[in-house]
């Protein structure tokens, strides 16, 4: 077929429709190739034959339109089977189908026939008919441009770069005006594109420096193709945005495919190249990559064909990768490995070096391709591939940097020397490659590399002789020890080789030291020194003695044989030794052997494994390496390695640690003092000026009265000439009114003087080298201010900071001389790199431009595209900004301003926005509107609430994923990322108010049964959000949303890597529901959507996880989560999956009004809301402590007062203090995250100790039943009943009525056995919690309540501080007791073997046992006290503690999960502070049943963790590091602890180190005895306290623990009268004080007893109420003989009515006993009764039972009384007078009524406790009722009194009987 200019359409059609062509097409279709994909095979099928014919015709018309005047002729077979085949393959792909083929065909036929060509059904989805008209103008314009380019190829090939751009511009503008005037009118910026492209070309040239010399034409081709495609895509998108056209026509695709490919075809066919098909495919690959990148990025969001796949974004790196992958398969088969490189680029954050390496490989492939296919040997391609692959430019810059460092300091330290040696090694490798022929480069580049190597050698020669004589890094020593013939030398040599490779050093970087040689012959500061057979031969000085000064930071001059090397200092970085000896020789004359031992940083012993034979290929295969450290008089094996790899890794890690430590040490030594060099400089400067002042000046000085003469004349900063005089003292003054005719004379005199001065300073033998090298900076006039102050930098910043004070201290006249010198010299500093670069550019420019001129255009385009891609930084910045510009009007403005440059004038003010008045902030950053958003940003409260509560980010490494928080400690995420996160790791969770750590566990992921792209993650460590947030989600969006489109919003928060902040964004969108197939891809991940939301807006990478919000039933709700995007024009969201909403046990959140934005947020707390109006929580505001009369104080000092319970307490005066705020603030700052590996090691050790205490027969850890949880077990130590008088918690407290008490109103029982009352709020909440706590962490609400206690006066008047405790809900406490009661029993029972001392009896022998156990380790004891211990615990530690307890207790997986969730709930809860609601995310609440146990375990974990970390830092042997129990004895009780430390390790582990280490983790610890002390020192045991008790030794075996006296006196000043009368409460206290004082001194106790009897009236009457000293002594003797448990934390709890003064049980032998006819005493322990139903035939009188009155049956009465002290179980005197002795009391009346109504029924007096007081009360009631006569009662009671002495008060009180 012949193509020629002026060819008619009929000529081409005749060829296309000829039978011969049809036959060839049939043959082509039948020709199947291996590389044919499914689309190529499809188009060759019979049914697609017409499409194939149209494609072939389009190609022929393209050729016909592209030929020049001379015409071309192509063989028909070649045209069909090679050129057409290659063309088809470039336009058809499996992923895009035939989309590109349609676009190209449409453009060609539009250009040829000026009409739209229909291709049957193939383009029905591609182009709607009504768009043809408006598209025509644009299509004609592009086709015209495409037709023009081929006809100009010949001419363009000879143009300069400027000509290429101008030619493009000229025709581009002409066609625009002719075919598409609306584009010019609407988008005037399109005509300025080419000016911008010129700037980009220049920018690219500057970026690539010398290697681009002569390549402007290539860059121009590349930039024109890339930027032209980009501009056309932008133009088209802008016209769509402005409404001028309604859809995209892929202008960029038509442009690059038709124009550039056509130009190429013309060239190759003209030259009759036999490889035209290959070249066609090559250039098509290149321009295809460009087209797909630009058009996909800037596609218009409307009018597109429906696509069935979602894609990622494109950019520069992606373009290169695409090109590389295609070229890999296409070019030389031996270069397939490049594909792996390209894939690797995806998996890393692309760095410049990686891109350069990729470009180098691409150019290398093209070089091979050009040579093999075209016979073209390209110098430029070879040079460029080497320069990019080896980063020659970076290598040269590093050489220049080394030279600058040497000149700046006149020396090079060892680190810089190692860089220098590494550069030499790289240079030698490149030289070797060039010599061996592996690297072919031009002579200029070869000379450049040789020049670099030569100058490096010169620099090295000078550098090795100029080391630092100051402080240096201590060398790193590896010392291999072992018997002879075990391979020590071989393993050391292998270590040297591996270290050399690691540091990129050459083979000459190792110096073998012979210790027998007196001189260091051949030492050139090699970084590695090896000493083989260390100490094997005797020498003087010995090898050991020589090593000590070498391995030091002090300077060490060497003994050199050559005079020229004298003064060299040792500063090698690494010393490797092998030796048969591990210790110093006795003859070594080393006086301090520790000095030698400490100089070996890695010491290992080599031995052979007898079970593994020697292997010549791997001599280390049968070696064993034992890492050893010296500690406490012996060597300890720290680790044993059986493989060399492990040893190498260990050595490398130690090397890094050592290097880091040495760098930190050197940084601390920066002392600023005047350099000796500057002292010299100042004296030489004085001398220079003196010598060079002419005789006339000195004569003037002598003759003038003030000795003043002309000094210098110079131009100031404004260019004005000024003259100055000077006197003998050096005072300088400006001369005024100088005759201008003298200017030249004075200037000449000045010039002579200052130039002579400069030469003298420069060449004077005494001028320091540093000054000489930095003189250019000192005389630079631009670095001086108008008053001659120096304000520049001298050399390196470090050097400048050291000498700047000296420069500024120079006298004014000296600074003026330096300034004037610089003016006269006018020098500029040029680096070594700049010098060689300029020379190289001159040589390369001509060679490259000559060569490139003759290249085929195809090669120019491909290479130009690659170079423009890697070098066009300015273009890619523009590209990125446009990719983010969105759609619509914002996009049009962004493009116009980007291309307009400085021509456009932009208004500086902006339209006011009503939203700006109170702009919503998220994470303290204003929410911004997306560029393409159309609506005005006006967010309502529900939208803000969604952002605040539900939006979060999951951050790991440098990746930030958006997630959606749900109530119940869970979040929603997307599969395509989270399904691949299969390893546990620490991540950061960023919420609206804070950031916190989460230990991510893959097993916590939950997949939904549906094919949802969304997945769920649950974790107890997540911070919860309010349950009310469930209302913000729409889980049935498909049903709730309208059909078709509806308005919605998209909310996102993505990481801005420039500012490293998460930026919140909002936009309005139009969404629609779609039900059709959508393929989604992410790397290798693939999935299919069948039902989703779609919105046609510009979404981009990292948008996944954004919230889609719409209005449902009048309220904003989350309807979906963005999970995919397509071509920067469409977004897709998955519907919210159906998440099970957990039931809340408390349902407490309904009482809260949540704030829209949290307040007062810290890491641990944040205020989230307030109690709703009308909700009030009763809290104590007045103390229950009553002050006693002064005479009852017994002369003791008042040291304590009741705590402050409210902010209105009068004792506060003017101080602003709220105890509630103070209580919540202790949780504000929890401690930091701990090293998980070490923490788990500690936990494992503790659990092992627990298992050691387990008795399999007795210790079972199953959960107990509810009754046991409430009542405890009778006779079972440590399992007491729940205190019934304490608060029931929230929200149950809201229903409490006046007179009702706490938990007691929710239980019923007979006084001994209690149960929950069915149907109450507590009972229902208990059932719900039991059911749900295995599945979710319960939402816990606690009431913060100030503690009513006695505090030191300083905490009242000086710095008020009231402790708060937390009241937790009753049902939570009951469930916790059920799950953990057996564990608590176990810990308390084994306190003699464990650290936790909860339950210890301080009066018995346990205190002695405690003291003796501490003294076993010695008498070095740390007595510690924590600050705000309650708020320190983090979720990390709490979760670990749950794992520890589960490990010990076992049980089903459900029970284990229940335990974990219950524990996690208490350190992530709500706290009520008066009317405020706070979120608390750390700490253990004090009202938690396990508080003291958990605090004790936490205390132990902290100390043991600190011990290991401190030992690791001290590098002690592993046997010590992991031997805590061997070297330390620790006891804990909550936050109290004592540590007894063995003397052997007190230098490693002491109070100072413990205090400093804990401080690093946010924990403050002080001396427990003296809390104001700034230090924590060891104490003797007698000087310590524990539980506010001291240690006093009474004998060798007995220690007592007296309570501190300040606490004792307070008991005499204040008493608690909750359950007792005042004098009874005081009696309890005074007895306790006398007992405690007895432990201090029996004489003091006896004296206090006497004072009490003398001063207290009621004690005068009954002195026997106070125990005598003998009785107290007997009390302690009795205590020491028994193992009593003390389960109460303090004395005040002893006054609890549940435990108070119950006499030893005097039970009846039988279940019943008849007192009088029909009146029986009944022991419920033997004959129980159902108290809720009673018994039909009798009246039941329950004594001291607990049952609400409204639940009592008709014939059941309950009588409860408060116990009185010392009254034998009878009620208090006051209650007895009112109810027992009074015949008309309410109790007596109630009994009388019942008996009268049921005269035939028997009466059972039912009781559970002591029968005696019940019998007494019954007798008295019988007297009142007339059933017993007074005389009979008298006799009966008298018998009882005779057997119970405590009842002798009865005759005085009960006068109705006695």
Curated annotation (Swiss-Prot):
Signal peptide range in chain numbering: none
Site feature location: Cleavage: 313-314, 908-909, 936-937, 1146-1147
UniProt GO molecular function: ATP binding; cysteine-type endopeptidase activity; RNA binding; RNA helicase activity; RNA-directed RNA polymerase activity
One example of a Gene Ontology biological process annotation: proteolysis
Location of the active site: 976 (for picornain 3c-like protease activity), 1013 (for picornain 3c-like protease activity), 1104 (for picornain 3c-like protease activity)
Domain RdRp catalytic: 1419-1549
Presence of the UniProt keyword Transmembrane in the record: yes
Record-linked Pfam families: Peptidase_C3, RdRP_1, RNA_helicase
Keywords: ATP-binding, Covalent protein-RNA linkage, Helicase, Host cytoplasm, Host endoplasmic reticulum, Host membrane, Hydrolase, Membrane, Nucleotide-binding, Nucleotidyltransferase, Phosphoprotein, Protease, RNA-directed RNA polymerase, Thiol protease, Transferase, Transmembrane, Transmembrane helix, Viral RNA replication
Protein name: RNA1 polyprotein
Record organism: Cowpea severe mosaic virus (strain DG)
Lineage: Viruses, Riboviria, Orthornavirae, Pisuviricota, Pisoniviricetes
